[in-house]
Amino acid sequence: MADGSKQTHKNPSTAQLVEFALARGEGELTANGALVAKTGERTGRSPNDRFIVKEASSENDIDWGSVNKPFAMDAFNALWDRVATYLADKETFVSELEVGADPEHYQPIEVKTETAWHQLFARNLFIVPEQFNVANKPVWQIMNAPGFECDPARDGTNSDATVIINFADRKVLLAGLKYAGEMKKSMFSVQNFLLPAKGVLPMHCSANVGSEGDTTLFFGLSGTGKTTLSADPKRFLIGDDEHGWAPGGVFNIEGGCYAKCIDLSQKNEPVIWDAIRFGTVLENVTLDEQRIPDYSNTELTENSRAAYPLEHIAQRKEENRGAEPNAVVFLTCDVSGVLPPVSKLSKEQAAYHFLSGYTAKVGSTEMGSTSAIQSTFSTCFGAPFFPRPAGVYAELLMKRIESFGSQVYLVNTGWTGGPHGVGKRFDIPTTRAIVDAIVSGELKDVETVHIDKLNLDVPVAVTGVDAKLLNPVNTWADKAEYDKYAQQLAEEFAANFTKYDVSDAIKQAGPKA
């Protein structure tokens, strides 16, 4: 286990890491066998502390700005050495893992952590290969030292913590951060940069496969139903969050899941519930006196999480990959009540809505009032993780859709009949019926009606769905009011889209403001 006096534990097992974490006071064992750890004041990602080293090999391909902030190479090297020195006389944990379940497109990574629980997280979320780095590729190094405190004046960081990606030297530095999700998302960002150069589209989506081998992808921001709808008892899960679409197939970038735990129940989410057992890391979950997790307690954060390997899910695709997708679903939660429950998209419309990444959220005050409603646009349904200009990903999406003939659908899991507070939300059985119709191929050649203002084509009939729900104008009592809200939404789409430098065919595929 140990090599040398520094006590570096190489490729430790799950049981060993749980033992180390408990012995070192890093966490507690729960009644269901999971390890619970707390991350202190940072209970989510710290986007202001994330940087990319600006260097010749990658700088012309990165979309620099508030998401991808530059960091000087010499400052990075100095900080890397400082953190390495800090870890040199400490007990550390190292694993040889991989990112990307594809023999051609994987990246080998060596993950070094100061704590046992972060190492367990890495082994749960990344891929533990049977044989490491078969193709003998250059290895990425991830160094994670949550106990190290950065000094902005000395180190050039934004605060006492940082995440820095260095493409030239294949290094990722995480210092001063306990929130483990930063590790997962930093390697997602790395693959999001590397894969497009090989003609592979990286995606922030979930994916599942039917018994006939047909793949469906679900894109969507938090709270739109990505995890719920992909956990389908009739289908096999590939993954819940990060995938690559290459000519010939879809592969998971990860080897595990990082599920939200807020209000988790056995009845509503049995797949996640059953996956939480020995080996799982629970992050910022509160326990009662009997060590039973209280998933409804949001004292620490609403962003409590469970990190577990895919092996904890019975109904999964063991190879961690599948065929190219027959169906691609963009999930949006429209709080204005304007969008139809399902629309069929052309490849240009697909690129438009992929770039827009529209969903909406309600402000915390005066829930029923329209002033509390905010629309949110997150490029490619995951703006914080895409280093290249957005158009690169949109063009790749169109290419993949066209070459395979995938059908793309926009599915609204939000409101109808009026905005939030007036209309009502589509219930889960309605959305599930729509997804079933998409997956079965029922909607591929269905008759549609065009909604001019939204520039969308809507099926006239879907099995198991009330026909009058399909065209949103029919669910509003006041048609003029619907038109007003539709105009407002179309204007928001248009205003958001001005930032994209893409072909006219894509620009004209959106709502007509």
Swiss-Prot record:
GO molecular function: ATP binding; metal ion binding; phosphoenolpyruvate carboxykinase (ATP) activity
Catalytic activity of the protein: oxaloacetate + ATP = phosphoenolpyruvate + ADP + CO2
InterPro entries to which the protein is assigned, alphabetical: PEP_carboxykinase_ATP (IPR001272), PEP_carboxykinase_C (IPR013035), PEP_carboxykinase_N (IPR008210), PEPCK_ATP_CS (IPR015994)
GO biological process: gluconeogenesis
Gene Ontology, cellular component aspect: cytosol
Keywords: ATP-binding, Cytoplasm, Decarboxylase, Gluconeogenesis, Lyase, Manganese, Metal-binding, Nucleotide-binding
Cofactor note as given: Binds 1 Mn(2+) ion per subunit.
Signal peptide coordinates: none
Cell compartments where the protein resides: Cytoplasm
Residues the record lists as binding ATP: 185, 204, 220-228, 269, 305, 431
The keyword Nucleotide-binding is assigned to this record: yes
Pathway given in the UniProt record: Carbohydrate biosynthesis; gluconeogenesis
Positions of Mn(2+) binding: 185, 204, 241
CDD domains the record matches: PEPCK_ATP
Record-listed E.C. numbers: 4.1.1.49
PROSITE patterns: PEPCK_ATP
Pfam (any one): PEPCK_ATP
Name of this protein: Phosphoenolpyruvate carboxykinase (ATP)
Organism: Shewanella loihica (strain ATCC BAA-1088 / PV-4)
Origin organism lineage: Bacteria, Pseudomonadati, Pseudomonadota, Gammaproteobacteria, Alteromonadales
The encoding gene: pckA
